[in-house]
Amino acid sequence: MNTEQLKTKLQTLDIFSGSIDLKFFEGFMSNDSYLASDDNNKYVVKIGGNREHYGVVNSHEVEASKAGYRAGISPKVIYNDDSILIFQYIDSNEITFEGIREKETLKRIVSLIKIIQKKVVNYLEGPNLSIELFQTIKNKITILKERNTPYADKFNNFVKDCELFERKYESHEIVFAHNDFYFKNILDDGKKLWLVDWEVSG
C-alpha cells in the first residue's frame, strides 16, 4: 500500500476530519508506519496484515497491543482491520541506540519486562501465540538459505550458538514476552517508557 492509497483509505474512516498529512517513520525493520495528522489529532498508522515470512499474525498483534494498553505501557488501539492498525499518538522521544545501553535506561527497561510478564499477560483476551524462539531462528535461517543469501556460510556457527543456549535454558520457566526491544520500539514521554510493536510477542 503506497502513501496515496493509505491516505485514501484513511479518509473513509470516521476517525479523521479534514485534510490528512502523512509522515513516514524511518528506521523500522519489518513494517511501515506513519504519523497521520488531521485538523484536530495525531495518530500512528501501521501497515498491518499477516506476514508469514516474519511469523506475524495480525489478530495476535492487535490483542497483545490491547493488553499492553490495559497494563499501561502501550498506546491505545484506535482502529484495526486486515491491512492497517491505528494507534493513539504518544508525544515522546525514541530511545536512541546509544541511550538504550545506559544503566538508568536499562533499569527502566527491566521494569517494563516485569510488567509484561506479570501484568500484560493477564490482560490478553484473544488466542495467545506461543513463540518458540529458537525454532523461529532456525526457520528463518532455513528460509534465508533457500533464498541463496550471501551470508549462508556464516550461519553454521550461529546455529551452534543457538543450540547451546537452547540446551542451557530448556528447563527455565516460559513467560509472555514482547520479544523485540529494538530501540525504536521504546518511547520515552519524559515520565515513563512505552512499548510499541507487539507483532512478535508471545
Where in the sequence are the language-model features?
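ATP-binding pocket architecture of kinase catalytic cores
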Residues: 23-131, 136, 146-154, 171
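Short small/polar-residue motifs
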Residues: 19, 73-75, 185
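Hydrophobic, well-ordered secondary-structure segments
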Residues: 106, 110-113, 159, 178, ...
